[in-house]
Regions:
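Carbohydrate-binding surfaces of carbohydrate-active enzymes
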Residues: 1-292
Length: 292
């Protein structure tokens, strides 16, 4: 069966699907769940972001499926580099899990790689966009103690006293402090669920037996990243039409999903509309719950 993981054939989809599901479940249990359990036993909160959250093919390769890892955290968190306002999936994956499990806080590491000339206007613009998608707490990147040597060019800016605008930064902080407080006093209500197509990515992601010519450009990765871009466009267009939505990961659905009074339920959230895009296959648990 192993050759089917590398070569395309009639059994390739199942072999790859089962492989990546196993990787995802074992990584979660051996890493995220253990860290989360240890933190709670020692009166700590577990948070942090995972790698390549924004690229569907790469995310599968390094995480299996990233959303189940968020379920192990006390504070779900992401990292959004540069002045990005076109990529919705990273925020939505994280905020959806927080919403479904009733965790409350959604933390975002912001402003990395924006440069020394990044303005207050830019910080508000990027922050407002992420807050509209579900973030409610910022973690600014970064606060350097010193600018000596290579530090000056290490993913600026530095949100600290070594910037010219530090004494005026209260203006930005007060704004986001009030916005964070207001949003965390309430609960988001989203009635539309979009099923995440990661299990389809599992069935497509193989590996070339002849090696990889370029890092992050392995044989199947680019096309799966394109699938992620198309999925992102769907979520973006829903939001632009004012249909705010949560994403539904099938592993989380299998654990927390149910049906009640014509509603599709995941944890603490109820949905009256379920969209299933780009799904070439479903976990049996998802299929059963949807058909109910």
């Amino acid at each position: 069966m192993i050759p089917y993981f590398y070569f395309n054939g009639e059994k390739s989809a199942k072999i790859r699907h089962d492989y990546w599901r196993t990787v995802s479940e074992r990584f979660k249990e051996a890493y995220s769940v253990q860290i989360g359990d240890w933190c709670r036993e020692n009166n700590l909160l577990f948070t942090g972001h995972f790698l390549q959250e924004d690229k569907m093919g790469l995310s599968c390769r390094v995480n299996g499926s990233v959303m189940p890892h968020y379920a192990a955290e006390d504070i779900q968190a992401i990292d959004m580099l540069t002045e990005r306002t076109e990529e919705y999936i990273t925020v939505k994956q994280c905020s959806s899990v927080s919403n479904q499990l009733g965790r409350g806080a959604v933390l975002s590491e912001m402003y990395g790689c924006t440069g020394w000339d990044f303005s207050f206007e830019g910080q508000k613009w990027v922050g407002d966009w992420q807050y509209a998608l579900g973030v409610n707490q910022r973690c600014q990147h970064l606060a350097l103690y010193s600018l000596r040597g290579c530090r000056k060019r290490d993913y600026p800016p530095s949100i600290n006293c070594n910037t010219s605008w530090w004494k005026e930064y209260k203006t930005v902080e007060d704004y986001f402090a009030r916005l964070s407080y207001m949003l965390r006093c309430g609960e988001p209500i989203r009635t539309v669920l979009v099923v995440h197509p990661m299990t389809t990515v599992w069935s497509r992601l193989g590996c070339s037996p002849y090696g990889n010519p370029k890092r992050n450009q392995e044989r199947d990765i680019p096309k799966l990243n394109e699938l992620g871009d198309t999925f992102n466009s769907l979520v973006k267009n829903l939001c632009k039409k004012h249909y705010d939505c949560d994403l539904g990961d099938e592993v989380i659905i299998s654990e927390y999903g149910s049906c009640s009074d014509d509603k599709f339920v995941i944890g603490k959230c109820e949905y009256n509309t379920v969209i299933m895009p780009f799904c070439e296959n479903l976990l049996s648990e998802t299929y059963t719950k949807v058909m109910e």
